[in-house]
Amino acid sequence: MNQSSAKGSGGRRSLWSQARELSQLAPPERNRWVDFLRALSILAVVFGHWLVAAPYIDEAGAVQGGHLLGILPWSQWLTWGFQVMPIFFLVGGYSNGVSWSARLRKAEPGQKGVYRDWFASRVQRLITPVFPVLLLWAALAFAMTMAGMDRDNVKMATQLALVPVWFLAVYLLVTAITPLSLKLWKKFGWLSFLGLVLGAWAIDYLTLLQNVPYVNFANFLFVWVGIHQLGYAWQDGRIGGGVAVMLLAVGLAALVWLTVFGPYPIAMIGVPGAEITNSMPPTIALLALGVTQTGLVLTLEPWGRKLLDNLALWTATVLMNGMIMTVYLWHLTAFVLVMVLAWLAGGIGLEMYPGTAEWWWTRPIWIAVYILALLPMIAVFARAERVFGPIRGGRTVPKLRVVLGVLAICIGLAMTAAISIASPEGLTGVRLWVVALPFVGAALMGFGPVYVWFKREPAEAA
């Protein structure tokens, strides 16, 4: 959706009035359900994280990093509703298919660098909001280390706050192969999806039954590209009412068979102490959940699109999509801030053991506090989703630089989530190479995060 810089008195308009104006400019052919599902999926993940993370103070007065799914096994069923990253990848397939097809239509015959420019622009819009949170936590990790804090605690706080960046590394790789995956869909249709399902099943077979090490990481592509492929089917009009209901039924049956009667855990995210995780790396069970959720949300699509004809609801959707990556990237920072303040205040609210009646009744209060802590972060950092610097002054970025750049970004983000930017040794207490990789990747791809942040006039945003 297009948005431009507010000038003069327009700069003083409320965010709601700006979103309302943008919502009224949306073309009538736009599928508003896509935007709604994008916002819904991220918000579900945010509230799921706030609910699952359950630190408390034990009888000895020590803070324990409680995990609700480990404390209350029945709560693992809740992840079937809160683990909605598959919906984000479904929406990503729809959006990337539309965007890439439009870019091809606009390209002149024989024009070079079409893919490189398209992909560099997509990367820039996704990675720019990461830079502020990454820099802040690098500075905090350094400051906490210099203050003499236990390095394990520094690592725990830093890793908890930054773990959401894992999905960006995967999503960038999935987006990178959009031209290939879309071409496969156009040529083979549903067979292109079935091939990925069989590939995910084969990886799980090698992992669980043959004990082949490391091969399970291939499912980051098989599973997520498979769900991304369903987005093409949706955009192509191949998932109508009957097909959507069939996907819902088949996906749910497979999910129950794999988890209730099969070897896979009920939880769709990692549970402390569990031998198998459905998300890191993903399994065929998570793919079954993705098919189930696809069938559900597309069965509801006609009702949802009619509902979004309501201007207030559509404006709220536009407003949320304008800050959605900021909400996602900063929500655990807000959580850590609240926990630290509660601890400094004598452990107020942390004396309740997770899962008790008292703990459940106080969840709405805690979530309200998390939202209040998040609001200033949105106010300061959401602009990173709306301002973009030029990519090499409009010149095409060389192919090798694009490849090296995206690899550096993805490796940096993956390491941030996997091993943390906090270092157990060294003078600074920070893994500087991990922090630097996304910035190096951005520079290689031709856009500078510092320039972007201080740029006053927002460029056109998708």
Tell me the role of every PLM-derived stretch.
Residues N2, K7-A462:
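Alpha-helical transmembrane segments and their immediate juxtamembrane cytosolic regions
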